[in-house]
Curated annotation (Swiss-Prot):
Protein name: A-type ATP synthase subunit E
Gene: atpE
Localization annotation: Cell membrane
Cross-referenced InterPro entries: ATPase_E_C, ATPase_V1_Esu
Coiled-coil ranges per UniProt: none
Length: 194
């Protein structure tokens, strides 16, 4: 075997080995590229899912916020309506006249008088505009006298001279009690709540 043949065999072997190395390198490169593409696709899908979840959370938050604002607006409107109804009732109580006003005032005084059966002197306070009415009613009660004005819609505040008892039977206090006790029913009637 000649030297040229040996050189040629070595070259062929080197070329074959180089081709094997190149093929191995290409296969490894193809695997790396395929893995990178798969990783990139997986990362892209993961990011898309994250973005979708974030968008869904933001949509839900926006919807919840809008619902809350709408509910607050409804509640505010209801409070305004209830306040106007309350003010209308107060106006009507303040404007009561004649027999109806006397009947209610006498009834409130009778209810308060139970607390002062042992009192010698009883002071009765009321609305300035009701002084004449109260003085007339008090003629039927021994030891009771009109003692002055109270800022109220009507009715009476009664105090005994020998006790620390004070009974507030004004239209205002009765309205407060009735309003609180019946607010749910009033609201249901006004707003058709179930």
């Amino acid at each position: 075997m000649s030297l040229d043949n040996v050189v040629e065999d070595i070259r062929d072997e080197a070329r074959a080995r180089a081709e094997d190395i190149r093929q191995d390198g290409q296969e490894q490169a193809d695997e790396i590229v395929a893995e990178a593409e798969a990783d990139a696709e997986e990362l892209l899908e993961s990011r898309k899912a994250d973005v979708e979840q974030q968008l869904e959370r933001e949509r839900e938050q926006a919807l919840s916020s809008a619902k809350l604002e709408a509910k607050q607006a409804r509640l505010s409107a209801r409070r305004d309506v209830l306040q106007r109804v309350r003010e209308q009732v107060e106006r009507e109580l303040a404007e009561l006249e004649g027999d109806r006003r006397e009947e209610l005032t006498r009834s409130l005084l009778d209810a308060a008088a139970v607390e002062f059966e042992d009192a010698d002197e009883v002071s009765v306070y009321g609305r300035a505009d009701d002084e004449e009415l109260l003085s007339s009613i008090l003629e039927d009660y021994d030891g009771y006298e009109f003692a002055g004005e109270r800022d109220c819609l009507g009715g009476v505040v009664v105090e005994g001279s020998n006790s620390r008892v004070r009974v507030n039977n004004t239209f205002d206090s009765v309205l407060d009690t009735v309003w609180e006790d019946n607010l749910k029913e009033v609201s249901a009637r006004l707003f058709d709540d179930q």
